[in-house]
Design a protein with these regions (language model features):
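A conserved pocket-lining segment of Rossmann-fold NAD(P)-dependent short-chain dehydrogenase/reductase
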Residues: 69, 78-108, 112, 116
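Mid/C-terminal beta-alpha module of Rossmann-like enzyme folds, strongest
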Residues: 112-175, 211
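Proline-glycine-enriched beta-turn/loop adjacent to the NAD(P) cofactor-binding site
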Residues: 18, 60-66
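Active-site Tyr-X1-5-Lys
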Residues: 22-25, 31-61
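Conserved Rossmann-fold NAD(P)-dependent oxidoreductase catalytic core, especially the SDR/UDP-sugar
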Residues: 1-38
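Amphipathic terminal alpha-helices
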Residues: 176, 185-219
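Non-catalytic, hydrophobic alpha-helical segments
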Residues: 109, 113, 129, 190, ...
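Glycine-rich Rossmann NAD(P)(H)-binding loop
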Residues: 65-67, 93-100, 127-135, 145
Length: 219
């Protein structure tokens, strides 16, 4: 649309997601957890197909709140769980006990994205922006529950998902694929992809600030 309108721009910066780069088995078709991932990937394809469009694609893992201020978007996976935990509604969770998440604080992601985007050599390239290491989901939950002064939920098998009330599942179902798998993006390779592990603040300390900010806003 911008091109048809005759607008001049230096380049498009597309924020995709690292989850479009799932490792596939031989002869396995690319699949997506949801339409969010699918549309992010389709947008990537469009940028690569259109001629004379300068672009840079950024693929973050799970973006959390600001590690300094604790500000957190209401659409975040972390926010949804904090809400349920704070109300003592999440009593069971059907995930593996060793599940882990790759979380990057939004300020760390944005700072690195701006640094990459300021360089001409990043035009036409795709970058993975993820944390140096995953964080155990159990550790995150236990820390959150301790800060919120509530009992942590019980981890149950996936077969026991029917034990969770529908009104709770409807809030977390879309996030289940992410907390059921321990994706380590830094070990993935794909032609034309640059893996970047920017300096990131500690996820647990970030969680402290997020919950402190959340609790203060509810007073």
């Amino acid at each position: 649309l911008a091109k048809k309108a005759g607008l001049k721009f230096e380049r498009f910066h597309h924020i995709s997601t690292a989850y479009v780069n799932r490792q596939l088995r031989k002869n396995e078709k690319r699949s997506f957890n949801n339409t969010y991932e699918q549309t992010k990937f389709e947008a990537e394809l469009l940028f690569r197909q259109i001629e004379n469009i300068p672009y840079t694609i950024y693929r973050p893992s799970i973006v959390s709140g600001n590690s300094v201020t604790g500000n957190l978007a209401a659409s975040s996976i972390i926010y949804k769980f904090i809400i349920l935990l704070s109300r003592n509604l999440l009593r069971k969770l059907p995930i593996d006990s060793d599940a882990s998440l790759n979380i990057i604080p939004v300020n760390n992601f944005v700072n690195k994205m701006l640094a990459i985007g300021s360089k001409k050599e990043s035009i036409g390239k795709t970058y993975h922006l993820t944390h140096q290491k995953n964080t155990e989901f159990r550790a995150l939950l236990e820390q959150a529950c301790s800060l919120l002064n509530v009992e942590p939920p019980e981890f149950v098998s996936r077969q026991q998902i029917e034990d969770i009330p529908n009104q709770i599942m409807q809030h977390i179902e879309v996030f289940m694929p992410y907390i059921r798998q321990s994706q380590k993006f830094e070990f993935q390779t794909e032609e034309g992809i640059t893996n970047i592990l920017p300096p990131c603040d500690n996820v647990i300390s970030t969680l402290h600030n997020i919950i402190h900010n959340f609790s203060s806003s509810k007073k």
